Regions:
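A cross-domain feature marking catalytic cores of carbohydrate-active enzymes
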Residues: 44-48, 81-83, 105-110, 142-144, ...
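Acidic-and-aromatic substrate-binding clefts and catalytic sites of carbohydrate-active enzymes
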Residues: 78-91, 111-121, 148-152, 187-193, ...
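A short, hydrophobic/aromatic-rich structural module that often spans a beta strand
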Residues: 84-111, 160, 188-195, 264-267, ...
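Active-site acidic/histidine proton-transfer and metal-coordination neighborhood
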Residues: 16, 23, 89, 102, ...
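Acidic (Asp/Glu)-rich catalytic clusters
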Residues: 35-39, 68-73, 87-105, 124-136, ...
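Active-site mouth loops of central-metabolism enzymes
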Residues: 48-62, 110-122, 154-157
Length: 317
């Protein structure tokens, strides 16, 4: 990915609604939201807020409390942070409760393609997961790190076998804790006939390794192909436990989630048809060429409203 100074790869590599509920209820009524739209739990990932804040020359790390308040103001119910240590959970817990924001999922980095590093990585995730479960987390999302962030290298077959084995071991241990592991990808895993992506699915047990479908990374990684995205959905739809939501127009990310290159209405219909209602996480970020018309809260407010319309059928009574 090219674009913002803090791009997804550097972010992942270096980044060491009680108060808003009533207001959202009023906004929902004013915008004509149905009861199902209001009941839908919708979360957002940390990454979009970092790039929106950076674009506005604001320091994301200056006040986590401010970030959570902005999330609540946008009408979004949940937050999916990138967690690198158990201490972060200790910091997050009281603030989540104060600002009325849930944390049903977290995102963690892992290095799993090297046998000598996989055990350490698994241990770190399990320590984080134990803390996170205590504050309401049920899904652990991981994107096994590439050989080099932003590099052209692809993993060998042997490395893919090591990674799949480690991913399943992690999934089994998380399952024993009452948690679910959800595998995530970026574009690099779609290289070379998507061999890395497919082996993480085919080479692991669906009971212990589920899929965090990042629709736009699949779309972009396969050459901006909706055909490839919906083929992935056909192949692995029953394994989807989390769905990352991002949109583009003419292959450039938009400020707010809406109509665009990916037909999310068709995607939602397919998942409902097969009886799958995953955890929904907005990840509508900006990049080079994205419009610059909205502040972070307004952009997420619009994303929130559109997502609730498209995925209204996913609300759990």
């Amino acid at each position: 990915m090219t674009g913002c100074t803090l791009n997804r790869r550097s972010f992942l590599n270096t980044l060491g609604m009680a108060a808003g509920g009533a207001a959202f209820g009023l906004r929902g009524q004013a915008s004509g939201m149905s009861q199902h739209q209001n009941k839908l739990h919708l979360a957002c990932n940390q990454y979009p807020w970092t790039v929106f804040y950076q674009r506005d020359k604001r320091n994301f790390d200056a006040s986590l409390d401010t970030v959570l308040q902005d999330i609540a103001r946008s009408g979004i119910n949940g937050y999916e942070p990138l967690v690198t240590s158990p201490a972060q959970i200790d910091q997050l817990g009281p603030l989540l409760k104060k600002d009325g924001v849930e944390m049903r999922s977290i995102y963690v980095n892992t290095v799993l393609h090297k046998a000598d590093e996989a055990d350490k990585s698994i241990g770190q995730v399990l320590a984080i997961a134990g803390k996170a479960k205590a504050v309401g987390t049920s899904i652990i999302v991981t994107n096994p790190s590439p050989i080099r962030w932003g590099g052209p290298e692809s993993k060998t077959d042997d490395q893919l076998k090591v990674q799949a084995d480690a991913l399943e071991r992690l999934g089994r241990q998380l399952s024993a804790m009452g948690l679910r592991l959800s595998y995530h990808n970026h574009d690099v895993e779609l290289r070379n006939a998507a061999r890395e992506f497919h082996h993480m699915m085919v080479g692991t047990d669906p009971k212990h390794v589920t899929l965090c479908l990042d629709a736009h990374w699949v779309y972009r990684g396969s050459g901006n192909s909706s055909v490839a995205l919906f083929d992935i959905l056909e192949l692995y739809g029953p394994r989807v436990t989390e769905l990352h939501l991002r949109q583009s127009v003419n292959q450039v990310w938009t400020e707010a989630f809406g109509d665009g290159d990916i037909d999310y209405r068709a995607l939602a219909k397919h998942l409902l048809t097969i009886g799958i209602k995953p955890h929904l996480v907005l990840e509508q970020a900006v990049e080079q060429g994205s419009p610059h018309l909205l502040d972070p809260v307004e952009a997420h407010r619009r994303s929130n409203e559109y997502a609730r319309q498209v995925f209204a059928g996913f609300a759990v009574d």
